[in-house]
Regions:
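Beta1/beta-strand and adjacent pyrophosphate-binding region of the FAD-binding site
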Residues: 2-16
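Glycine-rich FAD pyrophosphate-binding loop
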Residues: 25-46
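Dinucleotide-binding Rossmann-like beta1-alpha1 core, especially the glycine-rich loop
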Residues: 49-133
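Helix-loop-beta segment of a Rossmann-like dinucleotide-binding subdomain
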Residues: 126-170, 275-276, 342-350
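Helical element adjacent to the flavin cofactor pocket in flavoenzyme catalytic cores
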Residues: 143-200, 204-210, 357-366
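Active-site substrate-recognition segment that forms the wall
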Residues: 203-342
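C-terminal catalytic lobe of FAD-dependent flavoproteins
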Residues: 300-398
Length: 398
């Protein structure tokens, strides 16, 4: 394959695939993206939209590999929001330009000193009560401001799609449609005289990577799924709140992680994660709702929760397999290893929404380190496929 049609075929239209397509296109790479269903319809639109700098991974009272791997990401995203760098997010409004952490004052213990330490300077700030956000004005406790912020994931996907929409298609790919060789990849489409050729295959399909790894005979890396059981809350008294509650935590994870969203009915919806979601995977929906009410009464006692409407949402976080199924610290990019197709293939999981820029950086470096023949044309390649459409947030029909 001396002159392929494409530099790369990207599989998966969530945050990883769309960010990567924008990044590579801005560098002059000729790529298309294939999405099996709707853009962002897996994990991206079910995420809380937090762009965070790792403080929640340091709640044990010390910096960790996870907290430092992600520390620069808020600045990376703000660069994109300013229209600078390889991915242009200018014009995208954020849901909240600051995130907060709150706790009953007596429950922080040694974290009080850690939060005030030089190691966290510029990343967390204790606030005076007049500076508390509207959602915590009635809170009698300690509030910190973080450098983190929150994006509207639907608006984010729409902004990422805008400059590359002529390169994004819907196709539920099977292993039989792809054939790899030392020279690259061939994608066989119905009613086409010849296959579409590409130098590389970039798998960014989240949970969809798992079946593709098997279909392509790729032995390493492998995938793991870590489940969550999130909670959606509607209540007429809700004010916008974007905050971690760490009152009385006994392990380094927020008790509740709260984001606020338009519920599609003219009101505000709270979306709850944190320990509630990770511990809740073994609870039924009714048990999780009962437990969530107890946690809300404990953490947000100034609201009468008796009239709240609660629903739950189960999500699987797709990641590279880790020892004992633990949480990976960094975005993951690795060349495929196996006895199936020998074509150049990178397996990608951002592991967190915030780390999408880092994933794209890693892929761009890998491509630069292993140059391949330039495509026959630098014009957008029109495929005989329908366009992939953006998905919906999971509460839009709830």
């Amino acid at each position: 394959m001396t002159s392929p049609d494409l530099d790369a075929i990207i599989i998966g239209g969530g945050i990883a695939g769309l960010w990567l397509l924008n990044h590579l296109t801005s560098e002059g790479h000729h790529c298309v993206l294939l999405e099996a269903d709707t853009l962002g319809g897996g994990q991206t639109l079910a995420s809380q939209g937090m762009i965070h700098g790792g403080i929640k991974y340091a709640l044990g009272g010390a910096l960790t590999g996870a907290s430092e791997a992600i520390a620069d990401m808020p600045d990376r995203w703000r660069t994109a929001l300013a229209g600078e760098g390889p991915v242009d997010l200018s014009g995208l409004d954020v849901l909240a330009d600051r995130y907060y952490l709150f706790a009953e004052g007596s429950s922080l213990g040694r974290l009080t000193g850690f939060f005030a330490s030089r190691a966290l300077r510029g990343r967390i700030e204790r606030l005076d009560p007049p500076a508390y956000p509207a959602g915590l004005r009635n809170f009698d406790g300690v509030v910190y401001g973080l450098q983190d912020f929150v994006v509207d994931t639907q608006a984010l996907l729409a902004r990422l799609l805008q400059p590359v929409q002529d390169r994004v298609y819907r196709l539920r790919l099977t292993g039989e449609q792809l054939s790899g060789s030392e020279g690259g990849w061939a994608l066989n489409l119905p009613d086409q005289e010849r296959p579409v050729t590409a130098s590389r295959l970039l798998l960014c399909a989240g949970a969809g990577n798992g079946p593709l790894l098997d279909a392509l005979g790729i032995e390493q890396p492998r995938m793991q799924l870590r489940p969550l059981h999130q909670v959606l809350v509607r209540h007429p008294a809700l004010a916008p709140l974007f905050a971690h509650c760490v009152t009385g935590i006994r392990r380094p994870e927020p008790r509740l992680t709260i984001t606020s969203h338009d519920d599609g009915q003219g009101g505000i919806l709270w979306y709850l994660g944190g320990q509630l979601a990770t511990d809740g995977v073994d609870r039924s929906e009714s048990e999780q709702i009962d437990h969530a009410r107890k946690e809300l009464r404990r953490c947000v006692p100034w609201i009468d929760w008796s009239g709240a409407e609660l629903k739950t949402l189960r999500i699987d976080r797709a990641e590279p397999a880790q020892a004992r199924g633990g949480r990976p610290d960094e975005a993951f990019v690795q060349s495929a290893i196996g006895h199936g197709h020998p074509g150049k293939c990178l397996i990608c999981w951002p592991t967190k929404l915030s780390l999408a820029p880092d994933l794209a950086d890693q892929v761009a470096r890998a491509l630069a380190a292993d140059p391949t023949p330039a495509p026959a044309s630098d014009q957008a390649l029109e495929l005989p496929l329908p366009s992939a459409e953006p998905g919906k947030v999971p509460w839009s029909d709830s």
